[in-house]
Structures are given as C-alpha cells and as structure tokens.
C-alpha cells in the first residue's frame, strides 16, 4: 500500500483501516518515510541490560481524518539537528492536502497523536477546526520532543502535558 491512490479509490482503500500511505505520495500528510526499528534492533535497545531506557530510538505520530489514520515512527536522538528534522516531518500544507482527500462537506473528526518516552498525547477536533488543530499539533510536538525524561514523568503523573493550560486559555 505504499503507492499513491487517487480520488474515490483512496476512500475505498482506506475504509476503516489504518494505513501508512506512501512517503512523497499525493495522499499522506508526512514528508518523511516511516523509520520503525526492526525487531532485532528494538529488542537490543529495550533489553534488560540496556542503559538507554530514557532515550528511545524515536517517537510515533499520527494524523487521522475520519476513519483514515496515517502513522509514522521517526528517529529522534535529542540533538538540535534531529529536532529540526523531526519538526519538518509534516507541514500545514501537506496535512491540508491529505485532509482534503478525505473530508467532504460534513463534519468529520480529525486527530493528531504523538507518543514519546511512554507518554501519548492526542489532539482532536472536527474538520472545521483543522487549522487550529494543526497549530496546536505543531506546538505540542515541539514541546513534547524538548522535554527531559523527568519532565515527562512529572507531567504524566499530573495527568496533563506541559502547555495544556495555554491551550485551554487560547481555545476559550
């Protein structure tokens, strides 16, 4: 399913299934390919003897439009160059282009989700609020990727990510 699928064929293909979409295709919101580690690499990194428990290989993120979910695993090592690359994995235009393929005239649910260091944050809204959702996703992604392991754990124990108060104030 890595090829680009056009028009109504895309809706039929994506009927109720999770789909990666092809990197560089006309449908996916992502500009980078999936970089999921292989099973062997994952086991080595997450073994009992590993001292790198607080430094994952990367993070998972997804965009969903109605029943269609596009997901990626991207490598991230915490450096400035890696952060810049990760923040460019999708842009407002690529998300809008992908969404336009699946959003009709009716209100459709849209979601952005990111999982990093064991914490997962999902933002959701209707298709009419997609632009606001994209803005929040950009800030959320930047914030989550810049948190230290202790900050992530502290925010999880409080049940809210850093910056959640700002999102609440802006949405009122």
Curated annotation (Swiss-Prot):
Disulfide bridges in this chain: none
GO BP terms, alphabetized: symbiont-mediated suppression of host innate immune response
Classification via Gene3D superfamilies: RNA silencing suppressor P19
UniProt biased composition (Basic and acidic residues): 9-20, 159-172
Keyword Thylakoid: no
Start and end residues of each stretch annotated as Disordered: 1-38, 152-172
Record field: transmembrane: none
One Gene Ontology term of the molecular function aspect: RNA binding
Subunit structure: Homodimer.
Family membership noted in the UniProt record: Belongs to the tombusvirus protein p19 family.
Descriptive protein name: RNA silencing suppressor p19
Organism: Havel river virus (HaRV)
Source organism phylogeny: Viruses, Riboviria, Orthornavirae, Kitrinoviricota, Tolucaviricetes
